[in-house]
Amino acid sequence: MITRSRQVALALTALLTAGAACQARDHEPPKPPAPAPSAADTGAFTLVASGDVLPHDSIIERARFDAGGRGHDFRPMLAGARPVVAPADLALCHMETVYGANGDYSGYPLFKSPPEVAKALAATGYDGCSTASNHSVDDGADGIRRTLDALDRAGVRHAGTARTEAEADIATVLRAGRAQVAHLAYTLHTNGHPLPADQPWAVGLIDEARVVADARAARGAGADVVVVSLHWGTEWQDEPDGDQVALARSLTAARTGDRPDIDLILGTHAHVPQAYEKVNGTWVVYGMGDQIAGEMVNDQGVRDPRGNQSTIGRFTFAPPDRAGERWKVTKAEFVPQLFDVDAGRVVNLNRAIDEGADVRAVRDRIRDVVLSRGAAGDGLVMGK
């Protein structure tokens, strides 16, 4: 149960979410400001992407508390991200876990999350989510089916897992302004669990040749922008590992004619924020960290606050001067976040600092990691 001490929000969260932390069943976050008209006038669009949604047992318990004991409500948890997510033309999350049903929910090590997570993602403003992860087959084919069914009901698109071979063969394409954006997603492994029997297509596994082939197929089918989500890397490592760096170089070097096959790479899995880097002219986010997770313990068995730190990437794409050329990123930003495990809320750290919260050291640590591979020199800036 939620103890009295855990019902008391930390001061930094209270500063930001006094109105958003409503526990009523009909909680609706305030409507965010509309995107700047200038972006729409030029045909440009903004894309935001965030890290792992990883509901541990404590997160499930918190959502039940926020729902007043009747079901689960994850919307208050995500309310702090909504002012960044909802105004974007296209918003992508990473849904790390599969969903259970009828109260059969669990956290680590075999996750089965309440399907109400999908409703909260939609309410926050997410248009789609990558679903390929090391936990994709925690409950076999049934878990994949329940997850994608719930996302469909909520109106949230998905990429990376599939219920049928036909679904696996078709790229997820989303509209962002006047652009068609293909979203592809893959994971390095599934924690040693085999894919469902006779369903080798159920989870997208990282294979360089396959990723490039899928990106080219999506482009050939009419995608203006191709975004690839990769669940990769070494857990609890701030720096991208050698395999991440090598694969990023290879994927961003892939071209058809003079046009790169991939326009943006979004990384998850490490549990900690990792660097952003422009590689071969393409932005790569090695790792966005965990957007929602319980109190995290690292691979040394030690409570590690980095596991509740993350970023939202925000990229503005502008259309080419001539048809068939590349949509270019004209602005690249990152927004540092913290998940306040005591209050059960996502906190935008720069907004918290503006309101007087003493979280500058956490924000600065995230900033230093994000910029550690020279991204500032290529124009990456910190946003709110």
Give short role names for the model-derived ranges.
Residues 1-26:
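Secretory targeting and sorting signals
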Residues 2, 22-384:
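Acidic, metal/ion-coordinating pockets
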